Design a protein with these regions (language model features):
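Core catalytic region of metal-dependent phosphoesterases/phosphodiesterases
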Residues: 2-8, 12-106
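Flexible, gly/pro- and Lys/Arg-enriched active-site loops
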Residues: 94-96, 102-104, 123, 136-151, ...
Length: 170
């Protein structure tokens, strides 16, 4: 039975993301200095984990430049793109590599998006799995009477471990 994977903010081809830091200002968000090395390591890790028939929801910011789109054909899986703020190319550019393009996706009581939902909207869905924030957290507003959290799972490819939600196979 195929597995379902969620990944976000791969930023293939993005030299600047190699300089992103965690909130401590000391630890790099990604271990690579060279974007080509980063891209190759992420492709290798992706294909070691994701099989051709697995479903992958990419939660946005897949590539930073048009040249990096050519990497997509090398990635295993039946891919769906939830568009992010850096996914700026024409739909046809992405349709060559993704079965479906979406603004968001609702699955098993969860909403998948690139940017986090406003906390007042969470009651409708229960769980929002999103990208976009990298090492940052969703701010908490005490007026809502609950704590909202955002955990950093951006580019789990760096540690060669994807987050698998096989239980949600569709």
């Amino acid at each position: 039975m195929p597995s379902v994977f969620l990944v976000s903010d791969t930023h293939f081809g993005h030299a600047g993301v190699c300089r992103f830091m965690r909130n401590d200002g000391v630890t790099k968000l990604r271990p690579w200095d060279d974007p080509n090395e980063m891209d190759e390591a992420m492709v290798k890790a992706w294909n070691e984990r994701v099989k051709p028939n697995d479903k992958v929801y990419h939660l946005g910011d897949v590539v930073i430049n048009r040249k990096a789109l050519s990497i997509m054909h090398r990635l295993n899986g039946d891919k769906v793109l939830i568009r992010g703020n850096h996914d700026i190319f024409k739909d046809d550019d992405y349709r060559q590599h993704f079965r479906e393009l979406r603004a968001y996706h609702v699955m098993n009581g969860m909403i998948l998006s690139h940017i986090p939902l406003h906390p007042e909207s969470l009651g409708r869905f229960g769980v929002n799995i999103h990208g976009h924030l990298h090492a940052n957290r969703v701010m908490t507003n005490v007026r809502w009477g609950k704590t909202e959290r955002s955990e950093e799972h951006t580019s789990e490819l760096q540690s060669h471990s994807f987050i698998s939600y096989a239980v949600f196979c569709l």
